[in-house]
């Protein structure tokens, strides 16, 4: 990642050469922000669509240096490093209570999740069935509802509220639902119906499904992930 000093020195020198009046602090800050954003866009821009018969979603706040690649079939790869948030993967649109079979070479350094990830509307819900994670268990700072046994493992169920945060409908306030596997794995089959049914029994209602992907997410961390899902 290019440092603040490198960007600021280069940009300020260019400004001074063009204008003998020294730039103000505000002008230097504006130069840095613009230069930083241009550098961040050296990664893969956010996008959604279809590829080789699968839906894909890739989102980044441009804070990290991150590259997303759609590979053949149900496979994708992500590499990332730096200060920012990113999430992407392949799957389906709309989502459903399907069995999701996946395999991954998942190598996080820091805060990251490997999960079945999706959204619903009415109510607006962002949900995660976390199969593996880096240094931070996302259920630890949420309201824990209990544990369930699914697919031969224990999952911690939790719920949290996101206030004025990015969503599939723009900046909104919405609920997050979590099932976090306590015995981490990077391949297997996830029975989404069992998770959805368990959530419903705890008062965690879903709405009409939007997309559903096997996602890699990174937050102020680094790592690499190659994931393949089955039809």
Swiss-Prot record:
GO biological process: xylan catabolic process
Carbohydrate attachment residues: 99
Main localization, broad class: secreted
Keyword Kinase in annotation: no
EC number: 3.2.1.8
Compartments where located: Secreted
Annotated ranges, domain GH11: 42-230
GO molecular function: endo-1,4-beta-xylanase activity
Active site, renumbered: 126 (nucleophile), 217 (proton donor)
Signal peptide as annotated in the record: 1-18
Name this protein carries in UniProt: Endo-1,4-beta-xylanase 4
Organism: Pyricularia oryzae (strain 70-15 / ATCC MYA-4617 / FGSC 8958) (Rice blast fungus)
Gene name per UniProt: XYL4
């Amino acid at each position: 990642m290019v440092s603040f000093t490198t960007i600021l020195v280069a940009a300020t020198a260019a400004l001074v050469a063009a204008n003998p009046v020294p730039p103000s602090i505000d002008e230097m800050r504006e130069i840095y922000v613009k230069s930083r954003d241009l550098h961040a866009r050296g990664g893969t821009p956010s996008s959604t669509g279809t590829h080789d018969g699968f839906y894909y979603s890739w989102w980044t706040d441009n804070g990290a240096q991150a590259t997303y690649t759609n590979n053949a079939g149900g496979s994708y790869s992500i590499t990332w490093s730096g200060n920012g948030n990113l999430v992407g993967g392949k799957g389906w649109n709309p989502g459903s209570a399907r069995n999701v079979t996946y395999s991954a070479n998942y190598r996080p350094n820091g805060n990251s999740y490997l999960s079945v990830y999706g959204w619903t509307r009415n109510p607006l819900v962002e949900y995660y069935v976390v199969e593996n994670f880096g240094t931070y268990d996302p259920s630890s700072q949420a309201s824990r509802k209990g544990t369930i046994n699914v697919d031969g493992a224990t999952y911690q169920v939790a719920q949290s509220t996101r206030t004025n945060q990015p969503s599939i409908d723009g900046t909104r306030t919405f609920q997050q639902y979590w099932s976090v596997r306590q015995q981490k794995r990077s391949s297997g089959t996830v029975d989404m119906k069992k998770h959805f049914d368990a959530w419903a029994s705890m008062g965690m209602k879903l709405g009409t499904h939007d997309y559903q992907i096997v996602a890699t997410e990174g937050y102020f961390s680094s790592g690499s992930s190659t994931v393949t899902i089955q039809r």
